[in-house]
Amino acid sequence: MSILCTDFFAFDFELMFSKSCQYAIRAVLYLADKGKDGQCVGVKEIAETLEVPGPFLAKLLQQLSRNHIIGSTKGPHGGFCMTSAHLQASLIRVIECIDGPEVFSSCVLGLPACNAANPCPLHYQSLAYKQGMLKILKDKTIAEVAQQVPEIV
């Protein structure tokens, strides 16, 4: 059984992305492994495997499905899945769907008034980092990232 190594997310993702976004990324990568080729995986299985709250994860997966990042099927054998088209989408789509496109333009210290005219102490140092992360996440497909995530358990 594949479960996503939390070290993959340890520094960069926890610093930049909400817990909701982290759950969504982990779920999408799980689906890339278990729900590819249209094979449906239920919320309960995903939630138990990733050790995340089921009802909360269900809402995130529905949001991803409404935005065509993953597929879904209703009914007794329903669940969530990924087609080859879903797998070729860039990982940034998941992040923008859950945390919004402004995640890379917001202040790393969370200061609302931080901008080029009124920078926080980390504004310019974090700019290159954020731009680099944005490029990586735009360039990497869900399939590429899923293949690089180590299997444990």
Language model region names:
Residues 67-82:
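Beta-hairpin "wing" of winged helix-turn-helix
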Residues 28, 61-62:
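Short, hydrophobic-biased segments on the C-terminal half of alpha helices
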Residues 19-52, 71:
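N-terminal helix-turn-helix DNA-binding core of bacterial DNA-binding proteins
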Residues 79-99, 103:
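Charged, amphipathic alpha-helical coiled-coil/dimerization segments
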Residues 48, 65-66:
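Alpha-helical residues within the helix-turn-helix
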Residues 3-12, 105-153:
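C-terminal regulatory/oligomerization modules of transcriptional regulators
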Residues 55:
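Key DNA-contact positions within bacterial/archaeal DNA-binding proteins
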